[in-house]
Amino acid sequence: MASLLARPQQAVVRAAKPAAARPLRLVVRASAQKPQQQLAQLAKPALSAIVANALMAMPAAAEAGKIFDFNLTLPVMAGEFLLLMVFLEKTWFTPVGKVLDERDNLIRSKLGSVKDNTGDVDKLVLEAETILKSARSDVSAMINTKKAAKQSELDKTYNEAKAKITAEVESSIAGLEQESASMLKSLDAQVDKISAEVLKRVLPEGVRV
């Protein structure tokens, strides 16, 4: 395209008159086709690109001796840019914007539901704390009951063992005291007998104590 636009000035001067008529006919033809296409049918962008490239390839109808040569390149490029923007709007920006809007609405709805569930969560947390407190009190009461029952059982066993041991000790002491008394009586009798024999041997026969 740049090579076509960079043709020598002589070729532009030679083809000045016939080129002046041809672009006008093509422009009129393209303007007649545009309403028929209605710019909504962008399924065939190749046709628009071919027409635009043909217009850009034609030499400009400029007179020799002017400082600047103006042609249809700038309007054609502007038209291509507008067509590209319309095509992107229909095929890219609109679907992507729709998806982003749906995603935004979904996120907002989820955030709203989460905010609405905050009261329910607080209620459930309070209920859980109440249940935990009740369970702790029940467990503590159960432990105290078991501890009291076990302590009572231990006290009963201790008292029974103590009473049994005390009875056995008292019985043993009574038996020992009885044995001691009988032994003392036997010893007293033996002492009296021995004393009598000693006195009998020591004292004369006619003396009695």
Swiss-Prot record:
Q: Which GO MF terms does the UniProt record name?
A: ATP binding; proton transmembrane transporter activity
Taking the first listed entry, what is the main subcellular location of this protein, grouped into a coarse class? plastid
Q: Which residues form the signal peptide?
A: none
Q: Biological process (GO) annotations? A: proton motive force-driven ATP synthesis
Membrane topology recorded in Swiss-Prot or TrEMBL: Single-pass membrane protein
Listed as disulfide-bonded, the cysteine pairs are none
The portions of this protein that span the membrane are 67-87
The alphabetized UniProt keywords are: ATP-binding, CF(0), Chloroplast, Hydrogen ion transport, Ion transport, Membrane, Nucleotide-binding, Plastid, Thylakoid, Transit peptide, Transmembrane, Transmembrane helix, Transport
Task: Tell me where in or outside the cell this protein is found.
Answer: Plastid, Chloroplast thylakoid membrane
Q: Transit peptide residues?
A: 1-62
- Pfam families membership: ATP-synt_B
Q: Which GO terms describe its cellular component?
A: chloroplast thylakoid membrane; proton-transporting ATP synthase complex
Q: How does it assemble?
A: F-type ATPases have 2 components, F(1) - the catalytic core - and F(0) - the membrane proton channel. F(1) has five subunits: alpha(3), beta(3), gamma(1), delta(1), epsilon(1). F(0) has four main subunits: a(1), b(1), b'(1) and c(10-14). The alpha and beta chains form an alternating ring which encloses part of the gamma chain. F(1) is attached to F(0) by a central stalk formed by the gamma and epsilon chains, while a peripheral stalk is formed by the delta, b and b' chains.
Instruction: Please describe what this protein does.
Output: F(1)F(0) ATP synthase produces ATP from ADP in the presence of a proton or sodium gradient. F-type ATPases consist of two structural domains, F(1) containing the extramembraneous catalytic core and F(0) containing the membrane proton channel, linked together by a central stalk and a peripheral stalk. During catalysis, ATP synthesis in the catalytic domain of F(1) is coupled via a rotary mechanism of the central stalk subunits to proton translocation. Component of the F(0) channel, it forms part of the peripheral stalk, linking F(1) to F(0). The b'-subunit is a diverged and duplicated form of b found in plants and photosynthetic bacteria.
An additional note in the Swiss-Prot or TrEMBL entry is:
In plastids the F-type ATPase is also known as CF(1)CF(0).
The entry sums up its family as follows: Belongs to the ATPase B chain family.
Protein's name according to its UniProt entry: ATP synthase subunit b', chloroplastic
Native source organism of the sequence: Chlamydomonas reinhardtii (Chlamydomonas smithii)
Gene name tied to this protein: ATPF2
